[in-house]
């Protein structure tokens, strides 16, 4: 079938991964400064690569990887899941010799294409499989709490155990407590197994979830995977991945009583009644013990195992019943997750009411993984990006950028798309699909212009990986305050969906720090105890420096940590109790870009000064002169959308700032003019001196790469979107080509022009006089015409690519059976079975074009 093949027309491109980001184009500098960062493979975006049923073959693997490489992908992470209906004969059992052969083929192809190979350490999630015996499966405890006469022997009581537990439950502890009126309270604690099976498991991966608190069980689990590599001579991947902790109801392990006594200094058995009744201290100690066990017996052991085989680990710690900072810091690449779409209110950004869900990961949640990376000196923080950003088939490139920019400002610099489904090249559209959108693959119409997004990511991450973090404050993570709350339910999992309930005060503190113009990283007890004060700064064991530490008001701290903080203060460290703005300003310089104008930023230091990533995620343009918190004399703007450098107007520490709603920039500051590439220009004024509205002129509209074929061209008296033009146009997906002519006088031809496309649905490549000037794929949809416009007649060609929404709705109306995956198949954003037959036509194309001169 026809696919959306990537074609690269851009005149502004990134050089090879091991070269520098070099701008090519008439308005770009001819040579980049030698002190600016190199672009590496790690700066490119990665893909979570779903293998449905592991039903892959070498020909299609090579085709897929080739398409990913052409689009600008730098890494793939293989995650096998459930298969496709009626395709059982093609399924490949996980870790079988055939499966390992496919992995070797991927590794060989990726070496040729310079793509990094990663894989989940199992199928679906969490860790588990058929090789996990019930004795090593996730464990739980429950109690039967009863009141009986004191003359009754507790051992004689026939406790009412739930039927579903009788086969697995073992009496672990029986305790009696005298009560008034000749009664006694008897508590029986039973140990059982959750019997949770691996979610979304692939063939050969179905089985029990492993006990993450049991070091022996985890070791046995990893040994099974290791055996498959050793027996087949398959090279280990670059990276092993672990998804978010979703081991539900696992609140116990057989060794917990002894581990508790060793770590907490008293026997939990002696406090069983207090534990059952939810005593805050006892439950907090229990939760801390679980945290220690998942950290040491699972996360650290898994990472050590990967290192033994020359691999590294990438981990989502959220969901763990642990101090997230400790678990994130125990791996090589901590990874956070976005889940839903943030409503920033950006002007001109399309909204799709009823087809999106709120983003559970606000700035405070996104900062957990970057904090661990910063504090422990790890170079990369990754992200599971765009999970459930919108409903299936309705996600645009423009909707991706704002939430991505927020992740960048939180500290992410090594993003992964969630996700991409392996689908055979010739499978009828829409091919194989994963149930949680988005779909970043050649099966999606937006793939045509996805290389523009890929290039943007690569350029941003090149700078976000350069240098060192330069956040102002450490903030003590008050995990014990959280552990001491909601104690009737022993298990406390720190998943992104419930953090607003578990840590509302902490979230408020972090957002207040941000609004005051500062940035911060979270720190745990363990990492704080190894932090010292030297040279006027707090310095972590990894060498990351901070101007002070903020202790949230009234939080519970262990005595040794409290004494260490006091000792740091006695040495001269700035210790701030609460988060009073004045106290913070006495310790560090705020960034008025944040406090006055609401911009989101992250600042990093480098050998020559500092650099910023700045995003205007507000509903208004920002044009102002603002002081910077740093003192360098020279500034340079880098636009990662266009790959163009310009001199920044930086006078006596005041920066002239001009960012439209939705725009982002990189600012480089140094005390040397060596930062300037050869031929760099001054920043151009954005003041318009005239407009030419060509919306109502004569236009032609034709189609390329569309499915189904429209079969005709249209002559338009004014611009309009094409879903209203007829039955075939209303259901097609692909690219509509708008063409017109405009005449310029001699005086107008001397002006510098931009082209404003208004509300693009969804991305638009623009050619003027057959010269490609750029792709408008994100808000604001404005492009620089460079010197393409001439005196007299000028041809304008705009290739607009729409979403696949109208196409899939048409298939549902016709009863086409494309939902052919097993298990959960395809569901809507609320995890419900659905049809798209009732969707109204989604706008496709453009309605306005204005040339703006200055």
Segments from the language model and where they lie:
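Non-catalytic, glycine-rich low-complexity segments
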Residues: 34-39, 720-730, 815-854
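Extended acidic/polar, glycine-enriched regions
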Residues: 164-230, 651-690, 791-793
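Aromatic-lined ligand-binding clefts that engage carbohydrates, nucleic acids, or primary amines
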Residues: 627, 742-769, 776, 796-800
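Short acidic/polar inter-strand loop motif in beta-rich domains
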Residues: 674-675, 801-810
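Acidic/aromatic-lined carbohydrate-recognition and catalytic surfaces
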Residues: 81-199, 203-211
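Mature N-terminal segment immediately following signal peptide/propeptide cleavage
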Residues: 32-75
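Bacterial Sec-dependent N-terminal signal peptides
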Residues: 1-29
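Carbohydrate-binding surfaces of carbohydrate-active enzymes
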Residues: 45, 57, 61-62, 75, ...
